[in-house]
């Protein structure tokens, strides 16, 4: 992985694997380097996850020396050249992967949602012990929704305990710290949080970017307002909203003040929040990573028996 990714993963207390660093090189040379590493290490599967990897990059990774899997959200970036496509959204079957990866194994749907182990070992989901409003807008929050939402909560003198979570790539720490110091709200701030599950199981309502964190919120049965900030978040988030445990809004359609008004309205309806919590509890928490590995292993075994 790149130097930036190494820094992020190296700070994780739950990172289990050795890291193979990619030295500084032209991006066009990366696929050849990766293929060489996989061949030398006798790798069974190479898994690619990232929006920056285009069709040409993926094509260069396709090899008869190892299998190639890609994580995907929308199937909107051309041919995938993959032996396996992974998409944990329940409605991923509508994406038309038969056109862009006609020979690929499809690890798609809720059975393949990937969660860290902390979300598979939850012990306390008691509703009566939840008190906090949690605000989290992903690893970097490029549109500064954390600041805008917190400022709006300050303007209306919100009274509930508030937890702010910022990701490792968040660049507004100085400004956020100043705002927290200068407002009179009851705020706890976690930066690069290492134990998200313990925070979310104590959350009564979350305002969250509608990315992969929605699967973590669901696992913790946390009622949520999911804010769509990117097109690739729409499909999975619409499916989540249909399940009844969250509400869905689009960042382009409302201001931070309007978002906070919706939040306060929901907060003042404890029976509705409890109902959303119970609907989340009815949905199974699946070890999607284990199911993916099983599918990969079965495929390798079948290939070796040919």
Report the location of each language-model feature.
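A nucleotide-sugar donor-handling region in carbohydrate enzymes
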Residues: 79-143, 173-174
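C-terminal alpha-helical cap of glycosyltransferases
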Residues: 285-306
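Short alpha-helical segment that forms part of, or immediately flanks, the ligand-binding pocket
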Residues: 197, 214-220, 238
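A short, well-ordered alpha-helix in the C-terminal region of glycosyltransferases
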Residues: 265, 272-286
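Active-site and donor-binding regions of nucleotide-sugar-utilizing enzymes
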Residues: 1, 5-100
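Donor-nucleotide binding loops and adjacent catalytic segments primarily
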Residues: 128-202
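Acidic donor-binding loop of glycosyltransferase active sites
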Residues: 201-212
